[in-house]
Amino acid sequence: MKILVVGSGGREHAIIRALKKSPKAETIYALPGNGGIAADAICVEGSATDIDRVVSFSKDNGIDFVVVAPDNPLVLGMVDALNEAGIATFGPRANAAILEGSKVFSKNLMKKYGIPTARYETFDDAHAAVAYIEKMNEYPVVIKADGLALGKGVIIAQNFAEAQDAVKSIMEDKAFGASGNHIVVEQFLEGVEVSVLAFTDSKTVKPMISSMDHKRANDNDEGPNTGGMGTIAPNPYYTDVIAAECMEKIFLPTIRAMEQEGRPFKGCLYFGLMLTKNGPYVIEYNCRFGDPETQVVLPLLESDLLEIMLATYHETLADMEIRWSDKSAACVILASGGYPVKYQTGYEIHGLDADGQCEGAVVYHAGTKQSDGKYLTAGGRVLGVTCTGDTLELALEAAYKAVKNISFTDMHYRHDIGKKALSPEKF
């Protein structure tokens, strides 16, 4: 089969590396891909949001299957356009991708169908939002931009002044553009965050191994929110008992709710959960593989990813048995200094071989490009260094050992990835 993966980050690199293992995967293309992906797939020029380009390339090159990985093209309707052109895909149509594309929609859906989520109100007027926050007088308070914001549209305000600034930044200063025309103001939940990605064909849900993301830029969960600075899998807080509760109260009800609304969801559905003393709650949905969660989850997958994705498209997921390794995985993100705010790019990356890899680890490329045989930084998050091990300690030890062999100007990474997972506190 000829496969096209749309996207250019570490997540896409991890998907491509997993797809490569399938006997059915004959040729893999990436549009646009990046410097490191070029070692594993044929990179094609174009933008990941250019629907016409993706459709025409797929038709002209006899592509059998397209994996649309990022949120933007999914929300814009890339899967709809490909399906209308008769091309099989992995990913939800636009009317289902709204689950991530609009936080107002997703919160209202959860409320309507009794899916546990934090108490909230939605606003399209900044003054009304500020008045509500002042009246509630509960801190911390969570303020979320309605639309897509590269994983950075959530602000946890510790007091009224911070909340006021957050509302102004999102709604008046348009920090996230039109994504901030509406906001959600919600109750802050205490607990432990868990990420669970799941394959679904709109009827059946097959959760993947759980993971723990580290969203803050700096050690000890300090600094601004990022797209993610590292992950570990599995998440030790996510027990079999909690998994069964999530399936019954969250995963299946979400899929059934979407079906009921005439928005059947096919693809990867990401559940961002908070495990509280009162049980699991949904913090957010994403309509695609998480980044960097994918970089620890897929290395633990023992089944054929392409077969699973095809079953998702053909709605035969119930017949699939998906096997997972009982090892642990850890991923440390190497970022450009100053990310996620202001950072410089174009620096040479040292310590990688000709294929962009490093001994003792798998290196997933995110913001990289190749020039004159060298790898250069080309984004905020540059590389994801992933290792597996018989225990989480061993996986983390190997990942940090590999990180020491890689360097570039202003390289920044967290030194405490997985620390919370090594000594899980019980609820």
Stretch-by-stretch model annotation:
Residues 1-94:
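ATP-binding N-terminal substructure of ATP-dependent carboxylate-amine bond-forming enzymes
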Residues 21, 36-38, 60, 90, ...:
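Solvent-exposed alpha-helices and their adjacent loops that cap or buttress functional pockets
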Residues 43-50, 121-125, 157:
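Short acidic-hydrophobic, aromatic-tinged amphipathic segments that line or gate anion-handling sites
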Residues 90-153:
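A conserved helix-loop-beta module that forms one wall/lid of the active-site cleft
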Residues 153-294:
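Internal nucleotide-binding/catalytic subdomain
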Residues 247-269, 286-358, 370-371:
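Active-site "cap" helix and flanking loop/linker of ATP-utilizing ligase/carboxylase catalytic domains
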Residues 368-372, 376-427:
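Generic C-terminus detector
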